[in-house]
């Protein structure tokens, strides 16, 4: 600011413009699919979404077959429901590692990221719902001198 101000009216004219929030662009491959990876615990999911009837395929199987528990299927649908896009996209994903709960969380994270790649304007809704945040909680390692991560061996006073 090399100039000096004569009055407070000039203050607004001298303010430098702050850079706007980053703009996100639509990222789609040649087949019209958006791709993203999701992670949770030890599970890693690769997710592709494309406009369709709402069919979800996990490791080349129907979602009802792969995730038999209704809670896990509900977890996968959460980002689509929050974005009001349930039944509008076909989801194809491959998931490996971890257990079923971690895999469902990884697929949910991947669907959320793929939705933002397909429709960047949904980023605010999904971020507010916590779907774009990677859940960094993993199993605590076992320590030597202990039975498990924190549990000590049985202690006898006498």
Swiss-Prot record:
Polar residues composition-biased segments: 1-20
GO biological process: translation
Stretches that traverse the bilayer: none
Keywords: Ribonucleoprotein, Ribosomal protein
GO MF annotations, alphabetized: RNA binding; structural constituent of ribosome
Pfam families on file: Ribosomal_S9
Keyword presence, Ribonucleoprotein: yes
SUPFAM superfamilies reported for this sequence: Ribosomal protein S5 domain 2-like
Ranges for region Disordered: 1-29
InterPro entries from the UniProt entry: Ribosomal_Su5_D2-typ_SF, Ribosomal_uS9, Ribosomal_uS9_bac/plastid, Ribosomal_uS9_CS, Ribsml_uS5_D2-typ_fold_subgr
Any Gene Ontology CC annotation: cytosolic small ribosomal subunit
Keyword Disulfide bond attributed: no
Family to which this protein belongs: Belongs to the universal ribosomal protein uS9 family.
NCBIfam families found in the cross-reference section: PRK00132.1
Protein name (database record): Small ribosomal subunit protein uS9
Organism: Rhodopseudomonas palustris (strain BisB5)
